[in-house]
């Protein structure tokens, strides 16, 4: 699996629709300071589900939308789409048979985000789920920032373990276990409520039966 291209529009400095192709397994983006290289990395993280504006070097999510300049009007929305080559079937589940998988996210000026998988609207969770264990995600080890080495050195043990588990592909199983445990907990809570209702019904039935027995006695 590899990234084939990125399509951006209205995202930070990419005001016009822009398509950046990655024709091989190794590509480089070079240019002077301020030309938008970091914005490309921000775009990848954002479309993969990043929800913290601070991690995208902004104050609010609306900051990722092109804010206008002396010669250009502000954009009303931002859009980023990633196209992945999935010939190796690395992305499994219902998408394993797709040779290409597109992931898209848009945001309006009011901050409302919409996600898409292969042009079908989906939830943020759907995107994070299919990429679990692949090394891709809003804060995965696949996206290495300049400060990453410092962060790793100063990471708490549980934070460092999370990186190692993602690299080893364990995170997908931990997430599934967490979801299963959550479903089991909800099921137990529902069973307890059913048991309480059953007890209440039994009490009411007993009360009604006693009333029924006492009626002939009164007569």
Describe the residue ranges of each PLM region.
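Short "domain-exit" segments at the C-terminal end of structured domains
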Residues: 215-219
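Gly/Lys-enriched N-terminal cap/neck module of very large, oligomeric protein machines
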Residues: 2-210, 214
């Amino acid at each position: 699996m590899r990234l084939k291209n990125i399509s951006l529009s209205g995202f930070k400095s990419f005001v016009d629709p822009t398509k950046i192709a990655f024709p091989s397994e190794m590509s480089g983006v070079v240019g002077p300071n301020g030309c938008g290289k970091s914005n490309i990395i921000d775009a990848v993280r954002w479309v993969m589900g990043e929800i913290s504006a601070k991690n995208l070097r902004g104050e609010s999510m609306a900051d990722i939308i092109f804010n206008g300049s002396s010669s250009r009007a502000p954009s009303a929305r931002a859009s980023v789409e990633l196209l992945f080559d999935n010939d190796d079937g690395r992305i499994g589940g219902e998408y394993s048979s797709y040779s290409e998988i597109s992931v898209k996210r848009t945001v309006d000026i009011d901050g409302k985000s919409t996600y898409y998988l292969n042009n079908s609207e989906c939830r943020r969770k759907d995107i994070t789920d299919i990429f679990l264990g692949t090394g891709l995600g809003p804060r995965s080890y696949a996206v290495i920032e300049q400060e990453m080495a410092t962060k790793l050195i100063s990471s708490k043990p549980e934070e460092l373990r999370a990186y190692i588990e993602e690299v080893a592909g364990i995170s997908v199983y931990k997430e599934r276990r967490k979801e299963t445990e959550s479903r089991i907990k909800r099921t137990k809570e529902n069973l307890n409520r059913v048991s309480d209702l059953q007890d209440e019904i039994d009490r009411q039935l007993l009360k009604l039966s006693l009333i029924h027995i006492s009626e002939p006695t009164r007569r």
